[in-house]
Each structure stands twice: as structure tokens, then as C-alpha cells.
């Protein structure tokens, strides 16, 4: 009997992953206003069974709040989004790695759905924020994310709906077998490289909430860096 994401049994005759097999990871940087809510949501949805890892470069109370919620905190000098998240995905050793952001924009209540899809055989489950319109997202960011998805679709030859979502689930071999090179554009790289290397990737609609706290990403400089990463990674993978 296999078990679903809540630890129950199903009748397909094979053992599936449960939340005891899941690490929820994130890079954190001065998110004291929101990180406690995110970690409480993870704890509630997973019944405290998922491991949580925060790679943190904060100068505020974020790391203390994370530790108070039972998270493993890896301190790192601030070097950018991708450096922190790359460390976060490679630190734990559980067989399923889930990435999220620490600003309370992502629906932790959909973690069981993500784990169910991994148990169905998908290697990467990627949350699509734009499916429902992402009305909570600033208009400039929303249009930019649609443009990134179009660029990635053209360059990869595969329909991509949301390249920069922060909520994904990966089988551990995916994150360990690929060399990750990007910083600001890591979120796009984390989708494009597995997609073009033949891993089973699925995008699923997710709700998206208004962020708590102030964004640290400059929309213009950050957007240019992400577009550059999409082009670079797509071409590297197409011609490798």
C-alpha cells in the first residue's frame, strides 16, 4: 500500500513519499514580518513532519524567528537570491526538496498536491502563479513574468507558463545531478535545465498572495538579469 501526502494509504501497491521525506527550503533575507507565518503554515500542513531549511543573510530577527519555529538555519553572507537558494536545495538530504519564498506569497496548503504529483512520477512540480491571473502581483512584475514565460517557450521549444515561480518540488536526484550556475535568474534555471534534460516536469496552478514586507529585487535590473539567464541557460541546454 502506498501513502498519500497526508501519510494515508492508497491502493496502487507501491510505497510513496510522505512528508517525512520532504525538506522545505528557502533563502531568507530580512523577512521578519512574514517568515513566522510561512513556517507556521508549513508546520500545520505537514503536521510538523517536513524538515525546514533556511539559508539566511539577514540583519534583522529573521534567523531567530526561523529557529523558534524549528527550522535549520544556515547563515550565509548576502550574495544574492540564487546563491542562497542553491545552498538551500543542496543542504538537506531528504528525497524530496520543496522550494518556497519567505514572504507569505505562496500557498503552503498546496504542498500535499505537490507531493502527490511527485508520487505519481513527476521529477519536478512547478507552481504556476499566472494561471489564476496573479492579481496580487504588481502589474509590472506580472507583465514581466508573462514576457519571461514567452521568451523561455520560444527558446526551449516547450510551452512554459511561469519561469520565475519560487514554489516547486523536486526529486533529490534532479537538484544533485545538475550544476546550477545562475544567481538572480536561478528560479528560471531551476525549471529550464530539468525540462530540457528530459526530466518529467509539470506546471500546476497555484494561488498567489500579496507579499508581506518590502521586495528586495529591483524590477528593471532584476528583470534584465532574469531574461539574460533564460537566454543563456536555454541555449546552453539546447546545444549541450
Region locations from a protein language model:
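Short, acidic, metal-binding catalytic loop of nucleotide-sugar glycosyltransferases
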Residues: 40-49
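Short aromatic/hydrophobic "clamp" motif used to bind/position activated sugar donors
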Residues: 97
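A conserved acidic beta->alpha catalytic loop
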Residues: 56-63
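Hydrophobic helical membrane-anchoring modules
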Residues: 1-20, 33, 157, 181-240
